[in-house]
Regions:
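Boundary-proximal intrinsically disordered activation/regulatory segments immediately upstream
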Residues: 5-8, 12-67
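Amphipathic alpha-helical repeat scaffolds
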Residues: 46, 128-135, 249-253
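Short beta->alpha connector loops at strand-helix junctions that form conserved
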Residues: 83-84, 125, 151-152, 174, ...
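Glycine/small-residue-rich loop that forms an oxyanion/phosphate-binding "nest" at active or ligand-binding sites
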Residues: 83-97
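Acidic/glycine-rich phosphate/pyrophosphate-binding loops and surrounding catalytic core
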Residues: 95, 100, 104-116
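RNA substrate-binding interface of SAM-dependent RNA methyltransferases
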Residues: 113-199
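Structured adenosyl-cofactor binding patch, chiefly the S-adenosyl-L-methionine
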Residues: 142-143, 157-168, 225, 229-267
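Active-site/ligand-binding-proximal alpha/beta "capping" segment
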Residues: 195-247
Length: 267
């Protein structure tokens, strides 16, 4: 049995009903980008994610076990549905549901171009793996980077896999989907644009600023030739010992962490 609570100001009405097929269909559809874009919604599962995201985004629907609702009674939602674990398994993307699933409204962010020259931001050139994108957003959160600009072919920040990998960082990091070529052209001459390349200058000996744009490239191809032309400062993450044969490249998430960490170390 599932119980639905409809919130009305500070009180709620409770009705004993079975979750509708339309709600099950809606939740299932949000695994696809097409329907996330059409509805402006996304899903999140687990206590850490749901509690973090509920502090930043409007929760459209909250489905949780009675125990979870008792332990987290400060979380508000347009609609709260009480369900047991077996019911959650029917709608969960996880093998072992953690007691709560929430549907959130996607935020719409803007940015002030004049402020970009006063802080450090990230730009992602076709990072395609949702797990890598989620990791990068988590890294941005850790290093105090608020704005991440994603190319149109970068993975969707609101896919279930990406959301899960962020571990709640979406509540604090603003993701902007842009035409990256046009966006970086608009930044040209106004702030330094950094990127990592095999022929770049050693990041550990190069002078770094505490403002600018750090571009990270695609997992297999790195930064595209079109975007490379807009990079003003080429960086190299050196391998050790120098000149010795090692792995061909670093995972983009690992590389992002090393680059952001070195920038912040200079403060």
């Amino acid at each position: 049995m599932i119980i639905v609570f409809n919130w009305l100001q500070d009180s709620f009405q409770k009705t004993n009903i079975v979750i509708s097929k339309s709600k099950i269909k809606l939740i299932a559809s949000l695994s696809q980008k097409k329907f996330r874009d059409e509805t402006g919604l996304f899903i999140a599962e687990g206590t850490k994610l749901v509690t973090d995201l509920s502090s930043a985004f409007q929760c459209s629907m909250l489905i949780a076990t009675p125990q979870w609702l008792d332990e987290n009674n400060d979380i508000k939602a347009d609609e709260i549905i009480e369900a047991d674990i077996e019911e959650l398994k029917k709608i969960s993307n996880q093998k072992s549901p953690q007691g709560v699933l929430a549907v959130f409204r996607q935020p719409v962010y803007t940015y002030n171009p004049l402020e970009l020259n006063q802080k450090l931001s990230l730009a992602l050139d076709d990072v395609q793996d949702p797990g890598n994108l989620g990791t990068i957003l988590r890294i941005a959160d850790w290093f105090g980077i608020i704005d991440v600009f994603c190319s149109e072919h970068t993975a969707d920040a609101y896919s279930p896999k990406t959301v899960q990998a962020t571990m709640g960082a979406l509540a604090r990091v603003k993701v902007h989907t842009v035409n990256l070529n046009e966006f970086l052209q608009s930044c040209a001459g106004k702030l330094p644009i950094y990127g990592t390349f095999m022929d770049g200058e050693n990041i550990y000996s190069k002078t770094l600023t505490q403002h600018g744009m750090i571009v990270m490239g695609n997992e297999g191809n790195g930064i595209s030739p079109t975007i490379e032309k807009l990079v003003t400062e080429k960086l190299l993450i050196p391998n050790y010992p120098s000149g010795q044969i090692t792995s061909e490249s670093l995972n983009v998430g690992v590389a992002t962490a090393l680059v952001c960490g070195e920038f912040r170390r200079r403060t």
